């Protein structure tokens, strides 16, 4: 698979909205199977290919490509290197490999790597909290707050919850998350604390966050069903898995006594389908 800089820079943007599912799959397979012979492919080529995979939601394939590169020996632009490491960290968050997250964060701190949105600093604080090093985590968090131009209210809310001694504290789900750079960190912090995930996670990155939403028992069933539908459309789960989730929705006997009234009262199309499934 031979690429040149002109093709990458000129045409990748035009491929952003591929309509054909078959063409979409073939394009992803083409990108993820490139020959990474470092003598024939430049750092910029690698960056464009990996960036395109990441933008298309294929974080695992982007991660696997990066893992084939010896990032210490290849002449990679600093900005590109930081982008590669942010993908590695976010993939580990998305797959909930927290021990690997914390190991990578130590390496990145030693290398003085800068990641967007203070992702590395927040990862360090999160890992210190997991390690019960609360005093150090609090100190670093204070420094983080002082350094941020705009306070990250989502991170602070999650961090404060983790520090709380009251395990039954009421927690309002995070909504309107805009930053893809931090959404995987947020999802991991929510999952480790068994807190609900909002539908915003599905909207922001359905390929990588639908499954965590489905598996989150603390998340409301209407959102889990919505995530399951999206995951099924993206070939992430089978029809049997979707059916099993349909069956797990808890409808009352009273709701089955009057189907017309029940259906009119449900404002979620996916829950309506679950109701029909159980009614059949």
What are these regions (language model features)?
Residues 1-280:
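Alpha-helical solenoid repeat scaffolds
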